């Protein structure tokens, strides 16, 4: 039976018409047959046959129409950030708050696979229903972001570091959106590497335009550039995946062997890196921060 595309991916009032085993049978506005797993009922004591309730309607992988009372933040009419669960040859699988995951097809992702999102990243998406009534994730277009971002029309954010996620990647630069809703553009000349789609990055604000869009940079200010000892430590941290088993109480001989510097020089260097929020100093180790990783070149 073909599904009614009009109700798939949206919140609808459906009538409960019966119970078959552990599955409630529902009827849509155009007499569509919709199933509801009994475990999906929020309050069964207040759930009666013959009554209408609000549900989110979605297809399972076999094409059967199901409903849930757990309303997702993302529908076919609403955009939001969704967490990436995994990546495979078909594309990126995301969690939109439904009993099943949703696929963003590989055709909609960057051509360079190293720029694809990784598990734990977040994508700004809505739901798309295709001609076979299957449900996919659709990335937000520039037009959509322009309709929802929060403009900044003064210099209040100048030189501030802001956490934001990449929602669009072009050769000319990276387009980011922050949790506060700020839209940020980083020109290719202001970055050493390109962030992944959906990756959270730290960006320094360097200006704004007449539309209230912010301009950003991944490059450090001149006074934030590292001295020779700091650069040695930073480069080794990058080489060893952001973590080294050294701290201010490590032995002078071990420091000399690995970093070729005195313990005093090492302590001064990691102190400067810590003050610049490039590293964290923990018991027995130093690690790169998000700000530190933002300095990394390809």
Swiss-Prot record:
Domain of life: Bacteria
UniProt xrefs under InterPro entries: CvfB_fam, CvfB_S1_2nd, CvfB_S1_3rd, CvfB_S1_st, CvfB_WH, NA-bd_OB-fold, WH-like_DNA-bd_sf
Protein family according to the UniProt entry: Belongs to the CvfB family.
PANTHER family membership: CONSERVED VIRULENCE FACTOR B (PTHR37296:SF1)
Name under which the protein is recorded: Conserved virulence factor B
Organism: Staphylococcus epidermidis (strain ATCC 35984 / DSM 28319 / BCRC 17069 / CCUG 31568 / BM 3577 / RP62A)
Lineage per the UniProt record: Bacteria, Bacillati, Bacillota, Bacilli, Bacillales
Gene: cvfB
